[in-house]
Every structure is written in C-alpha cells, then in structure tokens.
Design a protein with these regions (language model features):
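N-terminal processing/targeting junctions
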Residues: 11-13, 23, 248
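Bacterial N-terminal signal peptides
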Residues: 19-30
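Detector for intrinsically disordered, low-structure N-terminal pre-sequences
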Residues: 13, 17-19, 47
Length: 252
C-alpha cells in the first residue's frame, strides 16, 4: 500500500511510463498491419498447342461404304395420304473421311453421296423402319417413284449428281458431339446442327445421327397429285450410320 502511494506521489515518473507504454503499443499495432512485401509474379499463360502438334494427334478414318448406311425417310401427306406410300431411300457408295483430334474442335467430317446410286424402297430397309412402311409397294410403283425422284422436278440428278455434307464446327464430348454441318444439296447450301453418337472400337469409328431437313430449304417443291390431295411431306428424316476405318498413314 505504501509503495502504491509513493508511486502516485511522483507524477513525472508515471507520465513517462504511460507514454513509453503507449508508444510501444502503437509500434506493435503498425507492425501487425503492414505485411512484408512479397515479390509479384505475372500470371503464366497456358501453352497453346501448335498446328503441327495438333496434326500429330489427329487420327484419320476413311468411310467404309459397305458397312455404312444413310437413309432418307420420305413421308406421305395430304387429305388422301393413305392412298400413297412412305418411302425409304438408301444411299450407296458413300465416300468421305473423318479426322478425329484430341481437341474435338479441330476434328472434321466430310461425306459425299452420289444421288444416282440411291436405292429406293428396298424390302429389308422398309422392314427395318417398321409399320409406317407397310405394305411393300410393287415393282411398278417403285420404278415410278424412281423416275419422279431422279427427274428435274425433284432431285434433278443429272444437274446435281452429289450431296455433300461437311463439318463446320464440333462441340461437346468425344462420345456425343454436336456437329454443325454444311449440306450442299440440289445446288443449295444450308447449315444445321446435328447431334451425334460416336463409338470407337479398335481401328473403327462408328458415328450415328438422326435429323431432319426440309425439301423447300434446298429449292425442291415437294411433289403432289390430284390438286394436293396426295402429297410428299416437306420434311425428310435422315438416319445416318457411318462406319470408318482408321488409316495408318499420318494426315497430310
């Protein structure tokens, strides 16, 4: 108790001790708020693969025509549609290639289909497509369909002998790409997005797709008879099953 009283009786000493303590606290506070300066580091850019590197990672597949199948499903329409037939038009001698890259966006697809090689209303193909394609038309009806289809009023096969399908952009996973394709058909080009399913099995590549096109988009007026009582529907369903074999030689 006496020591405390003695200390209180010496204000100069107390003032100096309080001032020193306050200064020390301020220094500590300043030291806590200012962190040591860290050397700055610039963000590192991700390496961009060169075209040569992409080419080395690209695998080329040649379309195998004997194993591939492209079908155009053509439907009847109009008030008396039941008097007509639905048709299965199969492409033959399909040509082209697929280049598959580790970077899907660098992949590509090209298909060429000779129009004159179309096979119309094959019995097996119609059976595959189900009840909508029963019954099987007779040979005379099939021949008439072929004449109309290849003629100037529809496909005009003499003037436009091939259909070309080329990829413009590919997006999505390797097993299910959305492929933007440019279709050149009947002298007209149109772009559509085609969802695909892709399966790799050893040295083979299988690409399947189902999509629709409108004849009128390609400058074709769908056929009709009896003042439109029996018509060919404008929309054509396209079913593709493309099988391609790996080509061992590196792409040029």
């Amino acid at each position: 108790m006496l020591d405390i009283l003695r200390f209180d009786q010496q204000p100069g000493i107390a003032h100096r001790l309080v001032s020193a303590s306050l200064a020390t606290s301020l220094l500590c506070l300043a030291a806590c708020q200012i962190s040591p300066e860290q050397p700055s580091s610039a963000p590192q850019a991700s390496p961009v693969p060169s075209r040569a590197a992409i080419a080395e990672e690209t695998v080329r597949y040649q379309i195998l025509s004997d194993l591939s199948d492209v079908r155009f499903l053509v439907f009847r329409a109009g008030p008396f549609a039941k008097l007509g037939h639905n048709h299965v038009v199969q492409a033959k001698n399909i040509r082209g290639e697929i280049r598959l890259s580790s970077d899907i966006r660098q992949s590509s697809l090209f298909i060429e289909i000779p129009v004159r090689d179309f096979h119309i209303d094959g019995e097996e193909a119609r059976l595959d497509e189900g009840a909508e394609f029963f019954p099987q038309p007779d040979d005379e009806a099939i021949a008439g369909t072929a004449r109309n289809m290849f003629g100037e009023r529809v496909l005009d096969a003499a003037q436009y002998p091939t259909i070309e399908i080329a990829s413009v952009a590919l997006n999505g996973p390797a097993w299910g790409m959305d492929v933007t394709v440019r279709i050149k058909f009947h002298g007209v080009e149109r772009e559509i997005v085609v969802p695909t399913v892709v399966d790799r099995n050893g040295g083979k590549l299988l690409v399947t797709a189902l999509f629709s096109i409108n004849q009128s988009d390609f400058g074709i007026v769908p056929m009709s008879v009896l003042g439109g009582a029996i018509q060919v529907a404008n929309t054509v369903r396209v079913r593709m099953r493309i099988v391609a074999g790996r080509v061992d030689a590196p792409p040029q």
